[in-house]
C-alpha cells in the first residue's frame, strides 16, 4: 500500500479573518479523505507563531472551529536533507520533525492569502493548494484586480482609491476626491481585506469620514466604489484540464442587513437567503460563468477561486466585483456549495485541489533553475 500523502492544513493567521479561518479549517479537516491523506493541523496564531496541534482526540463531527492548543509546540518550516518540506520544532525535543508533502492554506486576509505565505512556501519548495505569489497578491488587492480585469475587457463598477498617507495629510481634499464622479450611496472598502471586514455603505456625505477612518484601520489603501442597484452573483472556478465554472449562486441579504456584511455572513444565521442556482436565464448563466473564467485567467490564478459579480438591475449587465483565491470553506461557504451543486462533492473537491497542487509543484520542479552558455 502506498504511503499516504501528508497534507498540512494551515489555519489561523495574523489577519482580521482569523476566526473565519478556524471555521473553514474545521470543515476541511473533517472532509479530507483519510484513506489517501494524513492530515497535519498547523496553526498560525495572532502573533504569527506556527504551531503543530495534535488534534487526534478532536471530535471532528462536531467541531465548529479548529482550535489552537495553548501548549502546542512552535514549529518552523524548512527543507529536509532529501529536499522534502519538513516542520521542525523551535525548541529541540518539543516534538519530532514532521515531513510534509503539500500545504492546504485555509487562511484568509492579509499576510495569509496575499502572496506572503505562498512566497514562503515557494522558498521552502513545498507544494501548496491554490494560486501562486503573483495571482494571490493581485487578487487580494481590490484596486489592482479591477484594473487587470478592465484591461482584459471585463466591466467593473466605477470607483476611486485613497491612500492613508494622503488622507492623513489632507482630509478635506481626500473626502472630496473619494466621491469625485460618483453619486451616493457608495461602498467604502479596505483594498486588502475579505469577509466584508471594514466595509461600510455610505449614504450621506457626513458619514463618509467615519467610514474611511474605520476602513483605514485595516489597510493603507481604501477603495470607494459606486453603489449600484444590483443583484450579487457568485461563481466558483476550478482549474482542471480546462477551467470549470460552477452554476452561479445569488446572495439576498435579509432586510435588516443593507448589504452582505461580516455580521450577515458569519454572526446572523438568517443573514441572507441564497439562491443556488441563481435565478438567471440561460444566456445570463452562460455569460457570468464565462466572465468568471476570464477573470480567473486574466489574474493568472491557479487551483480555485470564487469570483463575485454585480448584475445591474437597470442595464442587465454584469460587472466584476472581486475575486477570492482562498474562499471560505465553512459550513455555509458558497464555494464548496456551488461546486457540489455542479457535480463536484466536497470530499472529491478537496482531493482534486491537493492533486492539482502536487501536479503544479512537479511542473515547477521540472524547470531549469540555472543557465550555462
From Swiss-Prot:
GO terms for cellular component: cytosol. It is found in: Cytoplasm. It holds the Pfam family Dala_Dala_lig_C. One of its GO terms (biological process) is cell wall organization. InterPro entries: ATP-grasp, ATP_grasp_subdomain_1, D-Ala_lig_Van_CS, D_ala_D_ala, Dala_Dala_lig_C, Dala_Dala_lig_N, PreATP-grasp_dom_sf. Keywords: ATP-binding, Cell shape, Cell wall biogenesis/degradation, Cytoplasm, Ligase, Magnesium, Manganese, Metal-binding, Nucleotide-binding, Peptidoglycan synthesis. Pathway: Cell wall biogenesis; peptidoglycan biosynthesis. Disulfide bonds: none annotated. Binds 2 magnesium or manganese ions per subunit. The keyword Ribosomal protein does not apply. Its cofactor is Mg(2+); Mn(2+). It catalyses: 2 D-alanine + ATP = D-alanyl-D-alanine + ADP + phosphate + H(+). Residues 146-355 form the ATP-grasp domain. Mg(2+) 2 binds at residues 322, 324. GO terms for molecular function: ATP binding; D-alanine-D-alanine ligase activity; metal ion binding. It comes from the Bacteria. The keyword Magnesium applies. Belongs to the D-alanine--D-alanine ligase family. Cell wall formation. PANTHER family: D-ALANINE--D-ALANINE LIGASE (PTHR23132), D-ALANINE--D-ALANINE LIGASE A (PTHR23132:SF25). This is D-alanine--D-alanine ligase A. It comes from Bradyrhizobium diazoefficiens (strain JCM 10833 / BCRC 13528 / IAM 13628 / NBRC 14792 / USDA 110). The lineage of its organism: Bacteria, Pseudomonadati, Pseudomonadota, Alphaproteobacteria, Hyphomicrobiales.
Amino acid at each position: 500500500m502506498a504511503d499516504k500523502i501528508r497534507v498540512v492544513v494551515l489555519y489561523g493567521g495574523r489577519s482580521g479573518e482569523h476566526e473565519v479561518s478556524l471555521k473553514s479549517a474545521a470543515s476541511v479537516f473533517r472532509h479530507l479523505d483519510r484513506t489517501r491523506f494524513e492530515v497535519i493541523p498547523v496553526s498560525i496564531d495572532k502573533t504569527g507563531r506556527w504551531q503543530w496541534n495534535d488534534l487526534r482526540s478532536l471530535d471532528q463531527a462536531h467541531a465548529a472551529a479548529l482550535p489552537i492548543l495553548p501548549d502546542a509546540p512552535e514549529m518552523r518550516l524548512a527543507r529536509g536533507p532529501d529536499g522534502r518540506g519538513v516542520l521542525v520544532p523551535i525548541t529541540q525535543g518539543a516534538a519530532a520533525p514532521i515531513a510534509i508533502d503539500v500545504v492546504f492554506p485555509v487562511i484568509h486576509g492579509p499576510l495569509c492569502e496575499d502572496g506572503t505565505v505562498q512566497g514562503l512556501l515557494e522558498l521552502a519548495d513545498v507544494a501548496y493548494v491554490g494560486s501562486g505569489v503573483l495571482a494571490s497578491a493581485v487578487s487580494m488587492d481590490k484596486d489592482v484586480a479591477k484594473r487587470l480585469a478592465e484591461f482584459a475587457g471585463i466591466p467593473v463598477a466605477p470607483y476611486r482609491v485613497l491612500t492613508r498617507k494622503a488622507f492623513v495629510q489632507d482630509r478635506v481634499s481626500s473626502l472630496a476626491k473619494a466621491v469625485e464622479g460618483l453619486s451616493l450611496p457608495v461602498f467604502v472598502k479596505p483594498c486588502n481585506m475579505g469577509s466584508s471586514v471594514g466595509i461600510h455603505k455610505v449614504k450621506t456625505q457626513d458619514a463618509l469620514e467615519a467610514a474611511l477612518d474605520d476602513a483605514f484601520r485595516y489597510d493603507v489603501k481604501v477603495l470607494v466604489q459606486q453603489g449600484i442597484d444590483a443583484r450579487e452573483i457568485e461563481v466558483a472556478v476550478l482549474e482542471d484540464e480546462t477551467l470549470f465554472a460552477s452554476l452561479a449562486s445569488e446572495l439576498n441579504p435579509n432586510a435588516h442587513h443593507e448589504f452582505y456584511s461580516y455580521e450577515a455572513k458569519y454572526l446572523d444565521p438568517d443573514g441572507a437567503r441564497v439562491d443556488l442556482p441563481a435565478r438567471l436565464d440561460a444566456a445570463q448563466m452562460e455569460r457570468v460563468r464565462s466572465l468568471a473564467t476570464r477573470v480567473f485567467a486574466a489574474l493568472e490564478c491557479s487551483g480555485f477561486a470564487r469570483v463575485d459579480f454585480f448584475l445591474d438591475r437597470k442595464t442587465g449587465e454584469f460587472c466584476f466585483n472581486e475575486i477570492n483565491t482562498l474562499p471560505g470553506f465553512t459550513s455555509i461557504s458558497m464555494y464548496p456549495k456551488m461546486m457540489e451543486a455542479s457535480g463536484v462533492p466536497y470530499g472529491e473537491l478537496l482531493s482534486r485541489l491537493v492533486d492539482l497542487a502536487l501536479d503544479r509543484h512537479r511542473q515547477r520542479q521540472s524547470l531549469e533553475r540555472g543557465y550555462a552558455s
